[in-house]
Swiss-Prot record:
EC assignment: 3.-.-.-
Protein name (record): Uncharacterized hydrolase in edin-B 3'region
EC top class named in words: hydrolase
Family membership: Belongs to the HAD-like hydrolase superfamily.
InterPro entries assigned to the protein according to its UniProt record, in alphabetical order: HAD-like_sf (IPR036412), HAD-SF_hydro_IIB (IPR006379), HAD_sf (IPR023214), SPP-like_dom (IPR006380)
UniProt keyword list: Hydrolase
A Pfam family it matches: S6PP
Amino acid sequence: MSKRLLLFDFDETYFKHNTNEEDLSHLREMEKLLEKLTNNNEVMTAVLTGSTFQSVMDKMDQVNMTFKPLHIFSDLSSKMFTWNNGEYIESETYKKKVFSEPFLFEDIEDILRHISAQYNVEFIPQRAFEGNETHYNFYFHSTGNHSNDRRILEALVRYANDQNYTARFSRSNPLAGDPENAYDIDFTPSNAGKLYATQFLMKKYNIPVKSILGFGDSGNDEAYLSYLEHAYLMSNSRDEALKQKFRLTKYPYYQGITLHVKEFVEGKYDY
């Protein structure tokens, strides 16, 4: 039997921000299953997240997660870390691929200034940026008109593309600490993103798409989930449009992941 690959978005998918005592038993059950499948060499696991690597580590510590996914792709999958001999090591191979093209904060500032001036809107940095970043993320607060929001954001994506930069947008998730009625704006190198990370792992391990199961809950999961044959949107997702597009987990959060991973490795989704 060929090995299977399990892919998880992190915030509000693999990790519930408001994990309570009742949730902990479901979390432990999920981790126990993933540990068993990993030790039996049945699956490989990877987290694909927009969060920074340190943020992922801190959140795992909050709920005392013990299972270590083999790979963590942080910063909207622009950085890759692999569990090796008791610690996570950043992949130099992946880093070289990410930085194969110019990616400068000054260029991104110019792009945002252009759109800000054209539409009289503001883009707010989500954090303090350091030098040589691989992911720059901003908030855009809704104008109050969904169609107008999309018009502005699609213009941003087009203009960024004209400057040879990759920009993405998705609705912010207040459950993950984002503001209400806002959008996440993400700039990454072209060789980055959750879909790119998925295809990188497929090539690295020679895994066909039919042997992959993916989970997500928000707009930045849409591209990679759409690429997979076996993909689930978390039933706790707040994105109504995505709920119409993808199969929903039977249960939210840890329970949902546990059930569908079990069914997947048992071959119930094979055809």
